[in-house]
Amino acid sequence: MSTCSLKPPDSRDSDVLIVGAGPTGLVLALWLTRLGVRVRIIDKTSEPGTTSRALAVQARTLEFYQQIGLADAVVERGRKVIAANLWVRGDKSARAVFGELGEGISPFPYALVFPQDEHEKLLIQRLAQLGVTIERDTELVSFEETADRVLARIKLPDGTTVASEAAYIAGCDGAHSTVRQALNIGFPGGIYTHLFYVADVQGSGPAMNGDLHVALDRADFLAVFPLKGEGRVRLVGTVRDEAARERDKLEWNDVSKTVMESMRVKVERVNWFSTYRVHHRVADRFRHGRAFLLGDAAHIHSPVGGQGMNTGIGDAVNLAWKFASVLHGRADASLLDTFEPERIAFARRLVATTDQAFTAVTSPTLTARLIRLDFVPALFPLLFKFKQARRYLFRTVSQTLVNYRGSSLSEGRAGSVHGGDRLPWVKITTSGTDRDNFEPLTSLDWQVHLYGQATSDLQTFCSQRNLSLHVFRWSPEMGRSGLQENAVYLVRPDGYVALADPTDSAAAVASYLEGHGLTLTK
C-alpha cells in the first residue's frame, strides 16, 4: 500500500471515505451528512444499476428513513403488498390477506415493494440536495492507516491516481469488496447451485393483480412482485444448476415457459432480464482498525425474505451515529468497538435462516416436495387467522424484532422492554391530533423518554446535560406495548433503548453516560 505525506487533521478530504454507492453506502452518506459529518463517496461504476435485484423495503428501514424525512417519498413511490398467494401445479392453492399486518407495532405496518434501482435514484437525489455528489468511475486502489487517519489512493475517471485522507473508511463495495480484500478478512460460506434470474415485465393474467405470488410446485423457485403501474411486475426465479449448464447463457426464452405454466402469466413485454449467482457468506470481521465493512461487503445470502438490502441499511444507521459521536468529540473512540458485535450476530443468524428457508423451497427431495405441495398451502392461510402469528411474522420479516440486548451498550429492563430493544412504537392522540413517540427521533440524538410524570430531578439533570427529555401522558396502550409507567428509557440516536430503568432515576442515566464515555454537551 502507498504512503502519503501527513496533513493537519482539518485538511482531511473527508471525515469518512465511503467506498460503494449502493443503498448501504448511500444511506450511510445520508445519515452522516445529516449528522454534520463530511463524507466522500466513490463508486467504480459509471452509473447506478438499472437491473436491480432487491425489492422489499421493510418497516424498520422505513422507520430509519422517517428519522431523516425520507419515508413518505419511498412509500409514495413504492407499492404496498395487500396479499400473498401460493401456486401449486399451475393453480392458485392458497391466499392470505396481509392488510395492516403490523398494526400497532410500527407506523409502517405493511410490506412495501420498491425496486432497488428506483430506490437508489431517490437516495442520490436526496444526497444531491444536501450537497453531496457521488464520484463515479472512481476506484479505490489501496489504503493504509496511521494513528489518526486513513491514507487512500484513488483512481479517477481519467486514469490518474490521487491521494485521499479520511478519519475512517467504510467498505460498502459489495460481495467482491476491495476494502475487505485489502484487509485480508475471510469471507467463508458457499454458493447456491441454482442460477437466479430477475425480469421486469409488462403483462396480464391472474398473477398480475397487485398481490405477491409464489409458485411452490417445482424445485425451481418463482415469485411475482407487484410494481407501480398497471400490469407491471418483477419476476424473481431460479433454475437448477444442471439445467443452467446446458446453455452458455440463460435468456428469457429459456424460462418463459415455466413462468407461464406456473402462474399463467401472459408476458407482453420484457423490459429487461438478467441472471446472477447467489452466495451465502459472512465476513470473519466487520472492522479492522479504522476500516469497516457494511452490507454485501460483510454478508450476502439468499434473497428469500427480502432481508439483504435492509440489513445493509441497518448496518449503515448503526455505524453512522457512532462515527458522528466520536468525530464530534461526544464519545470515546471505543464506541466504534460496538459496531461489529451488534451487527455480526444478526448477520450470522440471518444467513443461516435464509439458507434453511431457501433450501426448503427449492429442495427436490420427496419430503421437501410434500411439505411444499401439501403442508404449506394448507397451513399458510390458517396462520394469518391468528393475531399472534401475524404479529410474530411481521416483527421477524420487518426487522422490528432485531435487538442488541447482548451489546455492551445495553443495560436494564423496565416493563418488558430491555436495554438493546427497539423503542416500542406508540400512537398518541393529543387534542384530536394523531402523533407518536417516534417523532422526537428525527433529532438523530440521544434522548430520554418517560411515559407518565417526570420528577423535577430528572428534568433538571436532562437540562444540565443537554439531553432532550420527552414526557408522554400515560395510556393503557403504552403498557400493552411493553413500556412501564414512570420508567426512564434512554434512547440512542438510532431508536434503540440503551438503558431501561424502572426507578425514574437521573442517577441511573448519569451513571450510564459516564460509564460509556458519552459527553452530550459538546
Give the predicted meaning of each segment.
Residues 12-14, 158-168:
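Core beta-strand elements of the Rossmann-like FAD/NAD(P) dinucleotide-binding domain
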